[in-house]
Amino acid sequence: MKVQRGDTGKAVVVLSGGMDSTVCATLAVREYGAENIGALHVSYGQRTAAREKQAFAAVAERLGIQTRLAVETPFFRAIGGSALTDANIAVPDAGELIGHEIPVTYVPFRNAHLLAMAVSWAEVLGASKIYIGAVAQDSSGYPDCRPEFYEAYNLAVRRGTKAGDIEVVTPLIALRKHEIVSLGLELGAPFDLTWSCYSREDCACGVCDSCVLRLRAFEGAGAVDPVPYAPRLAGHD
């Protein structure tokens, strides 16, 4: 995938601080220039909220994105229903069915809420594009990462915004995880600053869905993951 510098418009990037969103942000910077990007981070009551926010700030700084908005949406914790936001639901180890069923780490309709905030901010900034690093294939099977979800969401955005010219773009949605790593390496994405683990903030656990998918992706790309993992996976440090 060859990335070329595009127009001089503005864009908003939904930046969690994870691997996919960081590659997506790097793409957006290549397209628009860091000075025309707004980076949005949402702390929604997830277990690793503090570590993810730290990663967001570090990634944005490395990429030169100065326009940033970090918000909190505590209602996800009140709603519950996900291992990421409900302390009574354990984060499971990745199983053989990874990607074939919706896991307990799915946060109900989360991406719709994140995008709603991104659209609101985009209207204020005058941005015409919203980048989100959703991945449909080789992923955890979340329903709000499907292409048809974004097609429907864009229709709502066109009908529900003042100018109707804001578009949600998903440049990674058809890529495999190892292809995302390869693209990120090609672009110089700061993988060393990212955080993907669902359960730990000191070092990555290496066994949750997110960690396993990430480790497989780096292995598939023939690269070494630069983030620290728990001692039992010391060989991946």
UniProtKB/Swiss-Prot annotation:
The EC number(s) this enzyme carries: 6.3.4.20
Names of required cofactors: Zn(2+)
Residues holding ATP: L15, S16, G17, G18, M19, D20, S21, T22, V23, C24, A25
GO biological process, one term: queuosine biosynthetic process
Statement: the UniProt record of this protein carries the keyword Iron-sulfur: no
Cofactor note as given: Binds 1 zinc ion per subunit.
SUPFAM superfamilies, alphabetized: Adenine nucleotide alpha hydrolases-like
Family, similarity comment: Belongs to the QueC family.
Name of this protein: 7-cyano-7-deazaguanine synthase
